[in-house]
């Protein structure tokens, strides 16, 4: 698959596969860098960050290594269940990467992205010593806080594309479906809850982050990894589906209703009597914080200095086909919703990509693998302001979690005896 000459004067072509099979494809990095430099930088951050969280988990011991493995498996299930098991709900396509799995649909860095998000959130929340009822909700919202700059900036730089007309992701925030934030809040909270609730049932007398017998840890890991996604889906049922599907309420409203409910539980937990954190920060703790700083600053630098219109994605995207052909989705309440089965390449509403870098030539019907081109910022200053605001909030939140809930032990004063 080759693309026409791009606006930077070089040929935008598919990455040359070094190794190619359905399970894993290894692509030439130089081709990918030429097409999408910000994507390569983003991937490197999550690969390194995922390995750092693993090293941190091993250094902490106890249940943290089990938790890390559980997150990894939970992410694989959550990111691929819809593509493989329920393809009618398949609604996003990653750009190609140096190492990508499952027929070119699962990049390596996405596997490690989930530990970067959820592990960092859970470890930061653990320092607050919140009551058990508040912890999953806090982990959910902190996961969203880590995710937001990634979601907003990466899609603008065509690191992936969304389905154009899927009703579940139709309502957007800077081209990010509001349900993406809802997804991260509910799936991470569900996984965290099941990981600990299962172990509390199997070994009720063992402290939360202390490892029990291998059977208890194995079953809690398997149950949370396999069922965390389904718990997250269930949390869509009481709020999102009735309000959005039955009453046509915008997904922004349903997300902020979820946010309000989470916040109430978290606030009650914060105002409860709870012990201060007595653990001193280790070198690995500071590495986690450094990794978060790099994560946030990378996306700030992208919107400040980089140009999305120079990013070109050659690979799998939404299949192109007849503009009027529909397919149906059935909601948990039995309603039938409809979406276009194919991308109508001559009439679509995803303004973060177009076909200008290939001379405006749209892909023919039947295309699944084709070239798309990033588009310029409509207002770069607005993106800079939004990401800056998120960075300010994240700085305050993580500083408070790590440094403001610490028990201060006064220095021991030794009185001298008078002779």
Model-predicted segments: where are they?
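Aromatic-rich, lipid-facing transmembrane alpha helices and their immediate juxtamembrane interface loops
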Residues: 1-419
């Amino acid at each position: 698959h080759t693309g026409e000459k791009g606006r930077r004067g070089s040929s935008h072509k598919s990455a040359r596969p070094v190794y190619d099979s359905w399970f894993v494809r290894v692509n030439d990095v130089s081709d990918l860098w030429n097409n999408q430099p910000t994507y390569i930088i983003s991937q490197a951050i999550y690969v390194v960050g995922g390995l750092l969280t693993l090293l941190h988990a091993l250094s902490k011991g106890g249940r943290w290594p089990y938790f890390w493995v559980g997150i990894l498996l939970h992410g694989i299930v959550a990111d691929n269940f819809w593509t493989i098991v329920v393809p009618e709900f398949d609604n996003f396509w990653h750009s190609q990467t140096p190492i990508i799995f499952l027929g070119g649909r699962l990049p390596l860095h996405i596997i490690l992205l989930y530990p970067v998000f959820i592990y960092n959130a859970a470890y930061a929340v653990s320092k607050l010593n919140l009551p058990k009822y508040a912890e999953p909700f806090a982990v959910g919202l902190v996961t969203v806080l880590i995710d937001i700059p990634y979601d907003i900036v990466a899609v603008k730089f065509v690191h992936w594309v969304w389905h154009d007309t899927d009703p579940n992701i139709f309502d957007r925030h800077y081209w990010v479906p509001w349900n993406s934030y809802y997804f991260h809040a509910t799936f991470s909270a569900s996984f965290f809850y099941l990981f600990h609730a299962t172990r509390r049932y199997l070994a009720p007398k063992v402290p939360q982050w202390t490892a029990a017998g291998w059977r208890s840890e194995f079953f809690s890991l398997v149950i949370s990894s396999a069922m965390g996604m389904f718990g997250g889906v269930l949390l869509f049922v009481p709020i999102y589906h009735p309000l959005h599907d039955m009453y046509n309420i915008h997904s922004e409203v349903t997300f902020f209703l979820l946010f309000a409910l989470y916040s109430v539980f978290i606030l009650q937990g914060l105002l409860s009597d709870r012990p201060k954190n007595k653990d001193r920060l280790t070198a690995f703790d500071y590495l986690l914080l450094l990794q978060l700083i790099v994560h946030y600053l990378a996306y700030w630098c992208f919107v400040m200095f980089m140009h999305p219109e120079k990013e070109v994605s050659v690979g799998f995207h939404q299949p192109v086909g007849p503009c009027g052909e529909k397919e149906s989705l059935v909601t948990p309440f039995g309603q039938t919703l409809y979406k276009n089965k194919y991308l109508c390449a001559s009439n679509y509403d995803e303004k973060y990509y177009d076909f200008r870098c290939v001379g405006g030539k749209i892909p023919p019907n039947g295309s699944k693998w084709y070239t798309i081109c990033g588009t310029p910022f409509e207002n770069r200053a607005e993106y800079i302001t939004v990401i800056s605001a998120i960075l300010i909030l994240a700085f305050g939140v993580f500083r408070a979690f790590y440094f403001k809930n610490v028990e201060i032990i006064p220095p021991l004063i030794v009185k001298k005896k008078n002779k």
